[in-house]
């Protein structure tokens, strides 16, 4: 888990070779457990095998960024439609509760703790909305896309949560989204969600270009 988090957070760079000697020292683990962890990360497309004996951090590209985020945005929009059609009173209450918790976190500092807490509440808010769809398999597919987007999202997360202006904009978006979902305006809620999930793209593109 620590290795996965370090890759997502950019502590290991794309295409960087993962030397077993460094990993055993860093995580105080034996070669066996590390190979298991690396095999799992290969399956998750965060690590690639080099010549069947070594490992590297998987590459990142603008093409992959656009593909993953487009897939996520369209998947989330569909799930919102289903959630509005199927969700009951308990679903509405959970969406409201998670929206409230997210809105309470307004502090803006550079600590990892702040980033983690905001992201946890942000994920919980979005998960509460789509949970109303009632489909275990669709939610599994959504989680898979979320994992694929994780490294790109963390680039966006650092730039967004550490900016008062951007954080306020996100707060406004979440308020509008919550109100529209609870009003059960399916068409508008779906489109708002789709656009909401696409907004990080320009920020990530700038960061990847070194701007």
Report the location of each language-model feature.
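C-terminal regulatory/effector modules of DNA-binding transcriptional regulators
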Residues: 26, 161-211
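Acidic active-site catalytic centers that drive phospho-/nucleotidyl reactions
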Residues: 36, 76, 122, 174, ...
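Short, flexible turn/loop "capping" segments at secondary-structure junctions
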Residues: 49, 122, 169-171
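Conserved amphipathic alpha-helical segments that form helical-bundle/coiled-coil interaction surfaces
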Residues: 89-156, 173-180, 188-200
């Amino acid at each position: 888990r620590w290795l996965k988090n370090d890759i997502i957070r950019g502590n290991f760079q794309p295409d960087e070779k993962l030397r077993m000697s460094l990993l055993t020292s860093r995580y105080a683990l034996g070669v066996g457990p590390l190979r298991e962890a690396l095999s799992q990360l290969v399956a998750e497309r965060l690590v690639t095998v080099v010549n069947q004996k070594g490992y590297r951090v998987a590459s990142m590209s603008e093409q992959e960024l656009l593909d993953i985020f487009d897939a996520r945005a369209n998947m989330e929009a569909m799930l919102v439609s289903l959630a509005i059609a199927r969700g009951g009173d308990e679903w509405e209450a959970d969406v409201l509760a998670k929206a409230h918790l997210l809105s309470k976190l307004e502090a803006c500092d550079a600590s990892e703790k702040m980033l983690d807490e905001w992201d946890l509440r942000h994920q919980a808010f979005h998960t509460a909305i789509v949970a109303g769809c009632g489909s275990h398999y669709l939610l599994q597919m959504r989680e898979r896309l979320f994992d694929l987007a994780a490294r790109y999202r963390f680039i966006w997360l650092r730039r967004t949560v550490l900016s008062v202006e951007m954080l306020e904009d996100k707060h406004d978006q979440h308020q509008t989204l919550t109100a529209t979902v609870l009003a059960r305006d399916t068409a508008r809620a779906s489109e708002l969600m789709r656009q909401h999930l696409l907004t990080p793209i320009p920020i990530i593109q700038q960061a990847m270009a070194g701007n």
